[in-house]
């Protein structure tokens, strides 16, 4: 896909950041851009190139593919073990980098970590859980669920994004999720 673009009056915060040089490069690139191309590569990875009037690439960007996770999910398996009568749910909000949900006993909230240099990468961080006491079997499932969330690093999409397998760094499945709603 190819098109034209015009960007003007660019403002940036310039708060202290490790990416400040990169932000200046992006600002300059946006100012010079007059056209763009969008390219789809393998595994549904999209790239945006902004081009100057001579056709030189001034900004090269990759769309992070974790957006497929945004929505409400039911947890069907933890570490390969089926969860019977699962009332474990997770709501993932990739644009806001937040998660929340139910463990079957407690509720939880946390943050999402993305690495723009790794395809299909996601981490769940800073997870906090309410402290209700439930029957031992529910507490064991909750504990396994929280550990699996913390081990997650890879998204594996199936069935058109209706099923997600979350894998650890060794590509072992830690969670199987089924979409409840977008």
PLM feature spans:
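Lipid interaction determinants
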Residues: 1-182
